Each structure stands twice: as C-alpha cells, then as structure tokens.
Amino acid sequence: MDYTAFCKNFFSATNIPVSLLKSGNPVYSALGEVLGLSVTTHWTMFPYRKNPEFCAISPDLEFGRVFIEGTEYDLIVGPAFSVPVTDQLVRQFMKEVAVPLNFRELLTEILCSMPQISHLQFARYLAFLHQCLNGKVVEPNEIF
C-alpha cells in the first residue's frame, strides 16, 4: 500500500492532519505540506500499549497513533480538538511541534478550519484507520 497517498487522501477527506513516520523518522506530514515546512525532526516513539491509542498532550490537544503492523510505520493522527481552537491552543501546539513563529497566522487559519470532534468520534476515526491499515476490528471504547 502507498501509505503516503493514503495519508494525503485521509487529510483531504477529513481535514484532520496526519503524519507518517518510519522508525520515528518523518515520511509525510499533512501540516508540513500545507505550511511548506520540511519536517525532519525524529520522533522518539514509545512502545505502544494499545493499537490504536491516544497520545494526548493536554485534555484539549489530542493525537492518535496507529501502528501499521508488520512494518516500521506509525500513523500519527492530529491534532484533534474537542473544543474551539484558541490562541492558547495554537501557541501550545506550536511549542510542542516546534513550528516557527512566522507560521502562526497560517497555522491558526488551518487549525480553526479543522472539524471539532468529540473524544468518541476521534476514537472512531482511529478504529477505522486501524481496520483499514491492519485489517483488524477494534471497538472505539477499547481505545480509552
């Protein structure tokens, strides 16, 4: 499967950012592509406890992770917001992912255009992605 094309199509269909990592190294980033940033920072990936799983930075700033079994790839989904995007959330996100300040206005516009989704809806997206990528069904409530 062409995982990069899959990520691009997911972002295009949902407007929820997604990144593809191979052994913790960025292969694709939807936000990086939109912002015109080269994403080269290595992510230290902790062993997953569940697949898929939540990776929350704060209660209002969530990511999800789907390990693509039998490969070295991880799909990082998000950020996802269950509350309206505020300046504080934008600043927090920029700090967490080291986005330069000169991208703040464009990033704010992008983040504000993303759908606001509940934790349960986000879990449903992760379960769907897990089924698509790994051929396994997981109930959204099992992700919590």
Outline where the language-model segments fall.
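A short beta-strand signature within small-molecule sensing/ligand-binding domains used
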Residues: 53-68, 72-77, 82-92
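Structured interaction and signal-relay segments at domain junctions
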Residues: 1-64
